[in-house]
Amino acid sequence: MQTSPLLTQLMEALRCLPGVGPKSAQRMAFTLLQRDRSGGMRLAQALTRAMSEIGHCADCRTFTEQDVCNICSNPRRQENGQICVVESPADIYAIEQTGQFSGRYFVLMGHLSPLDGIGPDDIGLDRLEQRLASEKISELILATNPTVEGEATANYIAELCAEAGVEASRIAHGVPVGGELEMVDGTTLSHSLAGRHKIIF
């Protein structure tokens, strides 16, 4: 089919987004061109600025346009002494929305995966080890995903903490609030039973 080369290029570019296939990309492209050209221009400008100006925090490795992000430079968070280790910057947003954590973070940008050739240095564990040795950390909270790779990564970091004399803890995981036991998979239910706690009145 004969079509505009620029339109084809736009649709192909939109397909780099997760979950966007040919049809979705086509719909987005036509919507921007037909109904919202000003929105398309804002999107293009925001993307251009973000791609050129956003880098990584020198301390925690999350996304920021500053050398050190607002969380790491916050004196109250520095005094807290807790560092929460996560796999991606998106995990920080999820935890921050709970309002339950007032410490700092360290972003791995992935997890250990020997089969894919991803080792400790590839996810910044050499830098984390330096922080364990040089900073006064009261607790390292391991909030990696509850996958095989996430658990292996958490165990590896826990060993680093033991060597550095820093307390390490793992976030709890199990039956979701509002969930029904019969709908929960066996592995999750096993974790819930193993991580049970006493009810004190």
Swiss-Prot record:
Pfam families: RecR_C, RecR_HhH, RecR_ZnF, Toprim_4. GO terms for molecular function: DNA binding; zinc ion binding. InterPro entries: DNA_Rcmb_RecR, Rcmb_RecR, Rcmb_RecR_Znf, TOPRIM_dom, TOPRIM_RecR. Coiled coil: none annotated. Residues 81-176 form the Toprim domain. A zinc finger (C4-type) spans 57-72. It comes from the Bacteria. Keywords: DNA damage, DNA recombination, DNA repair, Metal-binding, Zinc, Zinc-finger. PROSITE patterns: RECR, TOPRIM. CDD domains: TOPRIM_recR (cd01025). One of its GO terms (biological process) is recombinational repair. May play a role in DNA repair. It seems to be involved in an RecBC-independent recombinational process of DNA repair. It may act with RecF and RecO. Belongs to the RecR family. HAMAP family: RecR (MF_00017). This is Recombination protein RecR.
